[in-house]
């Protein structure tokens, strides 16, 4: 578990000079490159949700690691004036959700996905930066 958390920390780590595009694309592709063993641990952690709630769930440790790193990144972007004044926690949770769900879909569809992961990442970033309204 410590190895997985360390790998997540590394995947979502950033340099102060990273652009938002570089960071989100790098994080997305970093997760897609996780081994089957890593994904299996996350899968087990997700099954744990229905279990006991009196202990810190494994999935909470996974999500907290990712969301905290992303929130730190977005707070820096706010300070630098790179993004408008938005709730850094909200944008972190939203981006985490998209990356996490995409990872699950890529695991399900594997090489049979009807879209290239680079194109998907570009489209995802386009929606974040430009929205869906005309």
Where are these regions (language model features)?
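Short amphipathic alpha-helical interaction/hinge segments
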Residues: 1-9, 35, 39-43, 99-110
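Hydrophobic/aromatic-rich alpha-helical bundle segments in the mid-to-C-terminal region
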Residues: 56, 78-126
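Hydrophobic alpha-helical connector segments
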Residues: 8-37, 91-95, 121
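Amphipathic alpha-helical packing segments from all-alpha helical-bundle domains
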Residues: 22, 33-37, 53-80, 90, ...
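Short helix-capping/turn signature of helix-turn-helix
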Residues: 46-52
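C-terminal alpha-helix
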Residues: 73, 127-134
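Hydrophobic/aromatic residues within well-ordered alpha-helical segments
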Residues: 1-4, 27, 38, 62-66, ...
